[in-house]
Amino acid sequence: MVEVIDGGVTTPQGFKAAGVHSGVKYRSLDLALLYSETPATACVGYTSNNVKAAPVQVMMKENAEKLQAVVINSGNANALTGRRGIEDALEMKKVTANELGLDPLNVGVMSTGLIGRFMDMHKVRYGISRASRELFNGRQADANLAEAIMTTDTIKKECAVRVRLSDGTLVYIGAICKGSGMISPHMKVLHGTTLSLITTDANLSPAFREKWQRILDGSLNMVSVDGDQSTNDTSILLANGMAGGKVADDDPEFYEALNFVMTKIARTVAADGEGATKLIEVKVSGADTKDDAVKLVKTIINSPLVKSAIFGSDPNYGRIMMALGNSGCKFNLEDVRLTIKGGDMEVPILDSGAPVFQDERSVEVVRMAMDNKEVSILVDLGVGNETATGWGCDLTYDYVRINAEYST
């Protein structure tokens, strides 16, 4: 059974973290370092955007099966920076390796922030040196790392669980994530930004990468704040095996626990979308294929009209059906059922392709359901057995303001 506990990336055995101010940002913490006492099996998902940031290019090329440290800077994405950007990413790895006595190949690197600006490596080098001396474990270390990777995020995004595996081994999983804008990840293994670090003391092999892809596809890859996939999206799972026990690649208890952590992180990213006031959850069932279910979910959560309606608690369900029709997926309108859920209210809207209600009083009930911090849109296509769930947020005035003023 998965047990949620108070913790973050240093909760599993053997992990230490630091977050410091290097000067890339004016005041905030802006450089983070994660370290494992032993080399850890690394499973990594990267953005599938064709315009990839320098750190993503470097890590994809190296494709290391083991990592012992990850260095992250915020305030500068190191994207669209040409050869110099590649050299800067490599230098971040090298400086970190020298400070910790590691091989640079066992150091991961991530960046987030403004695109198209060169790194101030004097400040970054200073930050890495300082962070390497401040590595420790515990909640303050987790909090410092979480703060150091934030950009337009308004909250730290952390999660930790413990679970007993099938062989009796007690293992821990910790996670930290950032993401608020430019969020519509489509991360692939071996292929405003979502960066996530997941740590575990479970024993995993490099073959777990295939399962890691499936978990990403059902969690972070089902999040969309604005439909824009970042140049820097990266998600790193580190498993150092310090809990002992058998290889947990095929352990259903571990898979369930990791999937729980990633789903929780995904929901938190969506809820903290830039300017957001509401979390939107979209569940599609009865689809003919998995691809159709996923496409339908993404079409709904990416629709500016749907997002605006949720913001205003406007029961204009025609916008949801418009989005369904625009998805390109085939279905019979006569089979579709639509329900909106908010708080303890679950209101049928459409049945067999026709509205369940027409009177003003019923419309007000729908409005009340939508006037909650979390609104669920439930769509049953009635044609198959495939399902998908995704998360987004409402579109507010503040989203436009934040992005209009971002670089200033």
List the predicted regions and their residue ranges.
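A structural signal for small-residue-enriched, beta-sheet-centric alpha/beta enzyme cores
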Residues: 1-88, 97-408
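Generic structural marker for isolated residues within well-ordered, non-membrane alpha-helices
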Residues: 93
